[in-house]
């Protein structure tokens, strides 16, 4: 294991502690809670394993991703500019790039996944949507995808599988409790985080960047049901 990652995990690999207030406030949850993640438990019964099989079947098509601070990290884009879409900020005018986003051939090969994204996912607009594969022994060094000024739950990370030994760890917060059977979490990626696959299987997740548009009500219902399920 990389020395930097080993030290990071020693300092931060613990159970995340989240306390749910009695009253649900969607704006507070997303914008003000300071939570590093939030499980969308109302989506727990989706066909994650079928989606995993679709992604796994394309494993040899994935592109190497961010070699500068990772090892064994690869991606494949379902919705974007092409099947190897990077951060939209790297293409110039972000607004113009967003206008060009569309389904790639990958989505055509993954009908169950595409159906989830079009019929179930509670947002009107999809930005970049990618499968992310981390090979056995692979890792992603501690990094921050957004600035501190953009602190909010803004991206969805779905574990299509999460073999025992795989860890996604937020600095100062702890380990995200992803489920190997599939689970969806809203994430605040302004927090420093790192990932390590200490297993003998590829770890495949799906990352959804999105805009709610006119589906605020749908998102509200998913958030509220998840909140009270998580709270118990």
Question: Whereabouts are the PLM-identified features?
Answer:
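Non-heme Fe(II)/2-oxoglutarate
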Residues: 1-120
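Intrinsically disordered, low-complexity peptide-like regions
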Residues: 15, 23, 80, 141-143, ...
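Intrinsic-disorder/low-complexity, polar/charged segments enriched in Ser/Thr/Lys/Arg/Asp/Glu/Gln
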Residues: 35, 153-155, 205
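A residue-level signal for beta-strand positions that form part of recognition/binding surfaces
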Residues: 37, 128, 203
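Structured loops at beta-to-helix junctions and adjacent beta-edge loops in soluble globular domains
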Residues: 43, 68, 78-81, 134, ...
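A short, structural micro-pattern
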Residues: 70, 125, 152, 200-202
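Catalytic core of non-heme Fe(II) oxygenases with the double-stranded beta-helix
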Residues: 114-185
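Catalytic core of Fe(II)/2-oxoglutarate
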Residues: 162-232
């Amino acid at each position: 294991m990389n020395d930097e990652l080993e030290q990071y995990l020693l300092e931060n690999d613990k159970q995340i502690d989240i306390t749910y207030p009695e009253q649900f406030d969607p704006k507070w949850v997303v914008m003000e809670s300071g939570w590093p993640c939030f499980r969308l438990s109302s989506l727990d019964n989706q066909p994650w394993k079928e989606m995993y099989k679709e992604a796994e079947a394309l494993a040899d098509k994935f592109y190497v991703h961010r070699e500068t601070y990772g090892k064994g990290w690869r991606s494949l884009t379902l919705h974007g500019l092409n099947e190897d879409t990077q951060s939209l900020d790297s293409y110039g005018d972000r607004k113009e790039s967003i206008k060009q986003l569309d389904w790639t051939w990958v989505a055509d090969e993954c009908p169950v996944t595409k159906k989830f994204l079009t019929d179930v996912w509670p947002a009107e607009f999809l930005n970049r949507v990618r499968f992310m594969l981390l090979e056995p022994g692979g890792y992603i060094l501690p990094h921050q995808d957004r600035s501190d000024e953009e602190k909010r739950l803004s991206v969805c990370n779905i574990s299509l599988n999460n073999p025992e030994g795989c860890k996604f760890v937020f600095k100062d917060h702890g380990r995200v409790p992803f489920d190997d059977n599939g689970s969806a979490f809203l994430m605040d990626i302004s927090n420093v985080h790192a990932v390590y696959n200490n297993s003998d299987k590829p770890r495949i997740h799906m990352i959804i960047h999105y805009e709610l548009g006119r589906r605020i009500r749908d998102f509200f219902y998913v958030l509220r049901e998840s909140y009270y399920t998580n709270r118990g």
